[in-house]
From Swiss-Prot:
This is Cytochrome P450 750A1. It is found in: Membrane. GO terms for molecular function: heme binding; iron ion binding; monooxygenase activity; oxidoreductase activity, acting on paired donors, with incorporation or reduction of molecular oxygen. It is a single-pass membrane protein. It comes from Pinus taeda (Loblolly pine). Heme binds at residue 465. Pfam families: p450. Its cofactor is heme. It is an enzyme of class 1 (oxidoreductase). Keywords: Heme, Iron, Membrane, Metal-binding, Monooxygenase, Oxidoreductase, Transmembrane, Transmembrane helix. GO terms for cellular component: membrane. Its EC number is 1.14.-.-.
Length: 525
């Protein structure tokens, strides 16, 4: 056979893209093999596919999928999302290693589209990486915005808005004849409370724009983006394609909020100018935006508070305060409706503290022990975030005998930690507030700030939620008002109440909670 004929007999050459893909897969597989054979021992986990890693094993709801994988591979689970090494922690004992022993190493956040495109290139607190900006913003939050004194100064706001909610529920139910949307009543009241704290006034959905989408829609849109595993965040060369449309959605959502926030800031600046010329300006109770604008003007902290920072922090405080508290309240009400004996016990204890004719005050809450137990049990079963916002390792470290590479994304499965039977017993998935009665003497630190990592509804360590005290106060006060004023029932057997979760970052109910109120007190609410 001649050389020319031999060449003709060969198969046609592969196109260049196919060669490049095959080459990438080969080298990626070799790299994965090298990683698995290195001296440092990575945590156990399923083998990743080339390019996509373990994306093919992701199912919704993600916190349940990760719990199932942890049951197979262990409480420190290693995955790879695209090119990003990822560790999932599903036990309180292991969480302590990451969030206390090695807290500083895991104090950062991985870069995400949400922080870049919605929060003005990481000008917020929750999504910003560990560094000078985060430290200064965190300090402002803890020492200026969310102090005990500041929270106390808005006591009248919470009282007024919750009283308005009670009246609204009674009117909407037509004196108990019609089921009311408890979920909507709670979220509306919380939104009003938060806007009055943040900006001294309530806003309607029309204030956000004329497209029919309101603040609740905006919060849901951003929350969906937070909970989505955006392919571009994990496979960088696909980021420009925006395959899931997440970047477009975030930019659009940011534009809507930005126009509203700019107007709100300008109104505050104008109002401040007018107040400065008035004799009684000192009587004015500053809202959060007032405080931030004052810091931007005086710059005594060296934090250099810009308009973008004010907008990012304002939205973050609003969305975190509204969505997380609303979810906890609707799950608490759902569980109490399913367990009438627990509802009755809580109502009796509230009545024993404030009296049948009395009105619940925030100062009464400390004496209502069973209320604390109900809220803690709800947070254990339904943490405000089932999966905590991911951490990122600033350097390589060995944790629990496993090697954790630098820039590893670390996810705390708070939902799994709160339901760990080795900590909470065989009935870990059941709603039993009484389990906390035995712990009340010594207390249980919900923030994980000391040594208690049995449940971490607000995270732990440097990245713990700075607004947890205000959130717990608001949840307890709202729940006490709802139960002291009304008896509640649902259609049909309460034990059969639909308890399905929506597949979202903050795990709300899949369907709104509908219930019938009946006035308990011999007077109109």
């Amino acid at each position: 056979m001649s050389f020319d004929k031999l060449l003709q007999a060969l198969p046609p050459p592969l196109p260049l893209p196919a060669i490049l893909i095959a080459t990438f897969i080969f080298f990626f597989s070799c790299w994965i093999l090298h990683q698995s054979q290195r001296n440092e021992r990575l945590p156990p986990g399923p083998y990743p596919w080339p390019i996509i890693g373990n994306f093919h094993q992701v199912r919704l709801p993600l916190h349940r999928t990760l719990k199932n994988l942890a049951e197979k591979y262990g409480p420190i689970l290693f995955l790879r999302f695209g090119s990003v090494p990822t560790v999932v922690v599903s036990s309180s004992e292991k969480a302590k290693h990451f969030l206390k022993t090695h807290d500083l190493i895991f104090a950062s956040r991985p870069p995400t589209s949400v922080g870049k495109y919605f929060f003005y290139n990481f000008k917020d607190i929750a999504f910003s990486p560990y560094g000078d900006h985060w430290r200064k913003m965190r300090k402002i939050c803890v020492l200026e915005l969310l102090t005990s004194k500041r929270i106390e100064s808005f006591k009248h706001v919470r009282q007024e808005e919750l009283s308005a909610m009670i009246h609204s529920i009674w009117e909407e139910s037509e004196s108990g004849r019609i089921a009311v949307n408890v979920s909507k009543a709670i979220s509306t009241s919380l939104a009003n409370i938060l806007w009055r704290i943040l900006a001294r006034k309530k806003f309607s959905d029309n204030d956000l724009g004329a497209d029919g989408k309101g603040f609740a829609d905006l919060v849901v849109e951003v929350s969906i983006a937070v909970g989505s595993l955006n392919i571009g965040d994990f496979i960088p060369y696909l980021d420009c394609l925006d395959l899931q449309g997440i970047k477009r959605a975030l930019k659009k959502a940011n534009a809507r909020f930005d126009a509203f926030a700019e107007k709100m800031i300008d109104e505050h600046i104008n109002a401040s100018t007018i107040r400065n010329g008035e004799a009684d300006a000192g009587c004015h109770v500053k809202d959060i935006i007032d405080v931030l604008l004052e810091m931007a003007k005086n710059d005594n902290t060296g934090a250099k508070v810009t308009r973008e920072i004010i907008k990012a922090i304002t939205y973050e405080l609003f969305s975190a305060g509204m969505e997380t508290s609303a979810n906890v309240l609707e799950w608490a009400m759902s569980e109490l409706l399913r367990h009438p004996h627990a509802m009755k016990k809580l109502q009796q204890e509230i009545e024993s503290v404030v009296g049948q004719q009395g009105t619940v005050k925030e100062s009464d809450l400390a004496s209502i022990v069973y209320l604390h137990c109900v809220v803690k049990e709800t947070l254990r079963l339904y943490p405000s975030l089932p999966l905590a916002l991911p951490h990122e390792s600033l350097e390589a470290v060995t944790v629990g005998g496993y090697y954790i590479p630098k820039k590893t994304m670390v996810i705390m499965n708070l939902w799994a930690i709160g339901r760990d039977p080795s900590v909470w017993g065989a009935d870990a998935s059941e709603f039993k507030p009484e389990r906390f009665m035995q712990m009340e003497e010594n207390g249980i630190d919900l923030s994980g700030g000391q040594s208690d990592f049995r449940m971490l509804p607000f995270g732990a360590g440097r990245r713990t939620c700075p607004g947890s005290a205000m959130a717990i106060l608001t949840v307890e006060f709202t729940l006490a008002q709802l139960l002291h004023t009304f008896d509640w029932r649902v259609e049909g057997d309460p034990s059969e109440l639909d308890m399905k979760e929506a597949c979202a970052t903050k795990m709300p109910r899949q369907t709104p909670l509908l219930a019938y109120p009946r006035l308990r007190l011999p007077r109109c609410p």
